[in-house]
Amino acid sequence: MTVDPVLAINQNLGIAEMMDYVGQLQDEMIEHRRDLHAHPELLYDVVRTSGKVAELLEEWGITVRRNVGKHFGMGVVGLLQGLAGNGSTLLLRADMDALPIREGNELPYKSVNDGIMHACGHDAHTAMLLGAARTLAAFRERLSGTVIFVFQPAEEGAVKSPRDGRLLSGGRDLIEDSVLEGVDYAYALHVMPELPVGTLGIHPHYAMAASSHFKVGFQGTSGHHSAPHQAVDAIQMAARYIGEINGMMANRIDPQEAAVLAFGTLQAGTAINVIAEHSELTGTFRAFTKRTVAAITNGLQRHASAIAESYGGKYKLELREGITVVNNAEAVQQVLHAALAVLGEDQVILLEQPSLAGEDFGWYLEKVPGAFAFIGCGNKEKGIVHAIHQPQFNIDEAMLVHGARILVRLAIQHNGSASGKQK
């Protein structure tokens, strides 16, 4: 693995002292993570979580901006100005929201909110960034430039804006409220149980796919099964649509480009002997290039229109396009250097295959250079093997220190100074 030698850090910066400080915060980070895990909140409804985060940042002397987000106002942003002079502005992001999943783990800190669970590690992401924020605040005399700590709601989905009706995830909501103003680089870490604790994986270019959601409604006319010629069957329109879209994915999308589409729900009908007048399909599709996303989007529209016309019905298509997470080459080098220093060379992996899962950190990386990396949280010996979004998902909490140390090193690599002492 080749790492740019110009990223080498002079040891007189006291990096070892800062790494030790992070280690001393291990129990505190575990406590924060478990508290958040026990009290998960969904999407933009992160009142308790955001309040806790803001209070801690303020306690550590970090300037806090609450209620961030042009449309929903549930984000928290911490601003730390280094005291060693001017430098670049670095953004470090963690997501705060949980998932509508009933937890399957029997833990002392099991979710108290039935049907809601931190099954994607956002509790860990928040705890790691809190640890990094406290450390950098304690050593701000050694820091030049600015570090922005972004705690984001609603990574797991989009909600219709009360302002303009658009479907917005938390990343877009915060970006529209100027969180990227003046930012030079942006970074985020995400837990990955497929990687053992003590490791980090990163893709050199594409990290995650653009994950887009769609909903198609077909409107026909109801009628009795004895007289199908007097009705327009919305179930038949939906069934034909499923077949045609699957055919489109097999025959009209470039097989050299990774793409996948799947239907998730189909709702139709009210009685066993009545032709359904309405049907509704939902699903997702995932791809990496704008060309493929456009091809699928156009196909969804074209086939819905043609089917509705051929049956004499109507249709409505709603679409929320995702965005690909594209890592910047220089930022990847920064992550590699930080991870190698924290974990060791054998523990850092250049991932060959990008993930077809989605992540709205792509909206950040569309605007500014940066990188998105995966930090190992699995431990087979402890039975921590379940994938994200599963009821039995868990993490080896030793990864919290690893992640916080990597985030701290990223800040120092961009904005380190040899002067100053711990506050």
Predicted regions and their residues:
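Metal-dependent amide/peptide-bond hydrolase catalytic core
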Residues: 3-10, 236-423
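Acidic/His- and Gly-rich active-site-bordering loop/insert found
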Residues: 4-118, 127-145
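Divalent metal-coordination and catalytic microenvironments
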Residues: 36, 92, 122, 149, ...
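Histidine-centered active-site/metal-ligand motif
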Residues: 37-39, 44, 118, 122-125, ...
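Histidine/acidic-residue-rich, glycine-tolerant segments that coordinate divalent metal ions
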Residues: 74, 105-117, 123-124, 136, ...
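Non-cysteine beta-strand/loop elements that form the S-adenosyl-L-methionine
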Residues: 91-93, 214-217, 372-377
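Short glycine-enriched loops at secondary-structure junctions
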Residues: 94-99, 192, 209, 266-269, ...
